Amino acid sequence: LYISGGAALSPAVARTFFALGVPIYQGYGMTETSPIISVNKVGHNHPNTVGPALPNIEVRLGEGDELQVRGPTVMKGYWNREEATKAIFTEDGWLRTGDVCTIYPDGNIRITGRIKEIIVTSTGEKVPPADLESAITSDRLFSQCMVVGDDRPFIAAVAVVNPDEFKTVCGELGLDPAKPESLQDPAFRKAALKRIKTSTAGFPNYGVPRQVHCTLDAWTIDNGLLTPTLKMKRNLIRQRYTAEINALYDTLVKR
């Protein structure tokens, strides 16, 4: 029996293990909840969710679709940190997880992003990035992806390209994969955007990236762009690609 937690389970990874006859059960929790809140189980495994809440845990949606929980395994508070304790609990005693989610009628919980990570465009559209990024990386061309768009007129993306698939696409387009400039060739970028559009077909139009910057440089723990639990350090990635991100918007505005 394999349980996955700590970071979101990639749908591609889940499918691979399922095909090998090794089911993985994704769960979810926090240190403050000792630590499990929900988990999939045998006969009730939906890998795109973190399963239903444990029998002794109550869950609800708070403001902004934030997942809030209460139950006997939830902490009483932070030791000698009164202000932090007040901040994490609602007035009626529910713990704020900080995660945006959907709770389905069957009780399954799907985490769609962090409250602080929600992208708000300059037109006021709100886009939770996690689901969008997961959809994009379901395409084998993209191994990692971060979408951007805060205070911008539309959503764009920075994506790490799978080297093997990059070579395949370059061959189809008559480009040389050994040349770094092929990544930014208009033909390749058009092909990348087409694949992004296909993989995000179920999202509203305002949530689909209209521009993408591609790179072959993976984001890792060693280069400081991933946490030890393999979560993206969004601020650092944005800083690393500031010029490239600005260029995505400048290019479209000038057209």
Report the location of each language-model feature.
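Alpha-helix/helix-capping structural signal
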Residues: 7-8, 73, 164, 236
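C-terminal boundary motif of the adenylate-forming
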Residues: 100, 105, 139-165
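Ser/Thr-glycine-rich phosphate-binding loops at phosphate-binding pockets of nucleotides
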Residues: 29-33, 97, 121-122, 227-229
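Adenylate-forming
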Residues: 74, 108-137, 166-186, 205-209, ...
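Gly/Ser/Thr-rich phosphate-binding loop
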Residues: 1-45, 58, 143
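Conserved ATP-binding/catalytic segment of the ANL
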Residues: 53-121, 138
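Conserved C-terminal "lid"/linker of ANL adenylate-forming enzymes
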Residues: 119, 144-147, 153, 193-255
